[in-house]
Amino acid sequence: MADLTPVQVLPADIGILNFANIGSDSLAECNRLLDKNHRDHHMFVRDTAGHNHIVHAVLAVLALGGSPQELRDRYDDGASMQRPLPPCDAELLEKLNDPEVFMATLSERAQYTTFLTFFERKMAERGWRSVLQEYLFARTPLADAMLGRLYEGAYHALIHLGYGIEFQSPAIIAEALGQAASHDDSGIAQLFRSAEEEAVFQYPTPRGTPLIELVHEVRANDQIRTAPRWSDYGNKMRDGIVGRACEPMSTLASQFQIFPNEADLERRTAEMIGVCAYMSGAAQRPGRKRKIDFFHMHALNSALFFTVLIRQQWIRLEDRVRMVERKARLDLAWYAVAGSAALDATAITDYSSPESDGLGWDELFAAVNKEHDDGHAAKFIRALKNGEMVSRRYEQGEWAEFFPMKGDMWLKLARMCQDTTKGMPSDLKWIPFTGFEQPWKRADLAEAGETNTAEKVRLY
């Protein structure tokens, strides 16, 4: 694969959100592992759902101060399930400059390598920022299609792009664009378009509508809350929210709007991060052990990268605003997809465990780096620390009602994450669809004396 660009994270680009000293030996091992993944592995581990998380896992652990051995361990955790890169279609590659051909090829997973090579060549010609401007932010039919797909698959391509921009890696950015182009379509772009059309007729108050208020409105709306059905399984977004409730969902979501200035963008980005964290910890079920929702976890893990994105001054303000508005609107849709669980702040504020009560952030970073995991837990704890940092200035005073996460709730939720994922097999670390009763029947979530079984759901 001569066209593949080497992955080379430089010492000056080790992430704007790193919370630990990163050694040169760890950085060298990170580059070796990421380059091997780039050259050897498909972005998708199977034909439906299933994403390659190696980049996410390795870079999250690196940013938290991981050793070379910990980086190798996280690579090995994911390597066994990967598929080889599909072949590059040389004939198609030469035709992708035609927007009609490009659009007609979208969603073809077998063409991931073709898309990857296409974007690498484009970046070699004129740089990754220029390529992102054309293929995400140009407001053309092709760019709008790609931007919508960036949010598909529980935010995975978005997370990948976030890592690429944070660590200034053209190869990882090309992977993200290739993933977005070849990903299946659940109709999220339709939801975005409808919400943006509705937003034109909204008249936001000077302070805007709190996102957490809109979360509660989702649960109170019978048409939205009942649209996803358990029998939809992994298609609750496509068949449930987009299929059965697109109009009421987009109308409600359109109420989240950001005024076109840097101050409001910064505040509402922090607000979005806090609401994602709050949903993750507060969506519990009385009488069952605590467990964090798989999809709320992804909402928070992707939210971290909007701290990165809103600082990219080479992206026009209106495009940065659009990206954050879409993220918050999609978070509302995913809350509905997950079953609109009742949210209880005391699940976070009252959290206590003898295993973790004494752990601070540094101890949690060190502990999660040692866990056999595909990177989800390390990303989650890192995202919580970032959320604590960017939200602190807004948690009290005039914006307090917009920020449900306050003070030590961030650290308590990080401890909850560590306690409920450590030593667990991957399929038991999280719980999907917390608003439905079925997943809570898992035997490992039963209190003493109870025995239940739950249907397994294939996750992303």
Swiss-Prot record:
E.C. code: 1.-.-.-
Pathway in which this enzyme or protein is active: Secondary metabolite biosynthesis
Reported phenotype of the disruption mutant: Leads to total loss of monodictyphenone and agnestin biosynthesis and accumulates emodin and chrysophanol.
Record's signal peptide: none
GO function term, MF aspect, one: oxidoreductase activity
Record has NADP as a keyword: no
Keywords for the protein's UniProt record, in alphabetical order: Oxidoreductase
Cofactors named for this entry: NADPH
One Pfam family linked to the record: Questin_oxidase
Entry keyword Oxidoreductase: yes
Entry superkingdom: Eukaryota
The protein's enzyme class: oxidoreductase
InterPro entries reported for this sequence: Questin_oxidase-like
Family as reported in the entry's similarity comment: Belongs to the questin oxidase family.
Biological role stated in the UniProt entry: Baeyer-Villiger oxidase; part of the gene cluster that mediates the biosynthesis of agnestins, dihydroxy-xanthone metabolites. The pathway begins with the assembly and cyclization of atrochrysone thioester by the non-reducing polyketide synthase Agnpks1. The atrochrysone carboxyl ACP thioesterase AgnL7 then breaks the thioester bond and releases the atrochrysone carboxylic acid as the first enzyme-free intermediate.
Protein's recorded name: Baeyer-Villiger oxidase AgnL3
Organism: Paecilomyces divaricatus (Penicillium divaricatum)
Lineage: Eukaryota, Fungi, Dikarya, Ascomycota, Pezizomycotina
Name of the gene this protein is made from: AgnL3
